[in-house]
Amino acid sequence: MLLLPRPANYHLNCQKLYQFLVASQKNCDRNCSQIVSISLEIDSIDPLALLEKLARPHQLNFYFENKSKGEAIAAIDAVAQLQLAGANRFHLTQKFIRSCLKETDIFDSSNHTFAKPYFFCSFSFFSEATADYPFPVATVFLPRWQIARQGDRCVLVANLSIEADTNIDVFIQQLWRKIHEITSIEQPENEGNHFQREFSQVDVSSIDRFKQAVIDCSELIYEQQLSKVVLAHAIDVQANTNFNLFKCLNRLRQMHPDCYVFSTHNGKGQNFIGASPERLISIRDRQLFTDALAGSISRGKTTAEDTVLANQLLQSEKERHEHRVVIDFITQSLQELGIAPQLLSPRLRRLANIQHLWTPIQAKVPIDVHPLEIVAALHPTPAVGGVSRQLACKKIRTYEKFERGLYAAPLGWVNHQGDSEFIVGIRSALIDGDRARLYAGAGIVAGSNPDREIAEVRLKLQALLKALI
């Protein structure tokens, strides 16, 4: 059965689509092409299931889900892409998006939030890589196929290239054939995702080295050279079989429903995945939301113990100071862009195995400020970098003997009208066949204790490992 628009609208849509494509083709010069973005509402389906069926090892793809909001989006293959490095990567990405949009005609029969062109982006923590790392410093692509679900509504977006000599009838036939293939994919039965594999794990650098780094940074903080620095630790996991990306993602969204579950594939066999509690920015209709998320403690085994731990977190001078540093940085960075932030009441962000101090921040974005300008201003926040930013990042390079890559870095999307959502790629792992590198970090401020900091890191790593193994 062809799961396309309802029969009453099918002929009308085909007729309108044909007229749209003919008009778009007239915009093509003899030696150039035009991108057409075609959106169509389809029956509800799990975007992760489609990603599993349609993803190919040699193609870029991206997955982004916020289960608590009932939103999931899968982007598959690229009709246009850019990969680059350097300090001006955010600006060049912004130019690329604007250039693509100038060459894109839009056909939307769905009136869906996730219709029309969306550009998917990943940026590494540092603007230049110092070690061999499988992902570029910056990647942005317009997907050839995009499937998004919001609540019980689902939209398919096809971004395709059309040329001056394209046969429109054949083009439409091929499009409907592909749509039929996509919408005919059967969603798998829930087979259960409890799987155990044999594995070994090793610290990328020693625990003693991490503890010494905490001591050294604490001395710099005492000397007032730094206010905060975030130190990461990584473990390498070797399994006896290849990791099943889609089962891992499914486990992550089941285990961490209050987090952003994400995955990006580089087209060369490696995936970067995770479940991040930290939103960098979310913009809808020029309304900005961001999070100050810093200061943490474990969850209790009982309700009473959980309450005791929460009160300890709320009353901890060290944790509150760490949180305040992040708030001050975000508000100042937004003000420098001409954005007036409003702080909502502070609260706790309770996750499966950890709880954080959390202050939501919102603001109205001026019409002349692009989302990537905000991303560039905020990254890295003190929640993943430190204060002062430049010295903290220098110390991170000194003490961490591995490439952060996409860890603690911005991943997300920007659409055609300036809506955007980016998360911070923490609680994450680099997957390569039967190998995985898992990352987690801890914020070092005045009063930090090396044993407590490594315990916090291990808590975060074990939660991620549980989803993979």
What do these predicted regions represent?
Residues 119-121, 229, 260-265, 405-412:
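A short glycine-rich, hydrophobically flanked beta-strand micro-motif that places a catalytic Asp/Glu
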Residues 360-469:
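Conserved hydrophobic core element of enzyme catalytic domains
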Residues 7, 40, 200-207, 238-242, ...:
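Hydrophobic alpha-helical scaffolding
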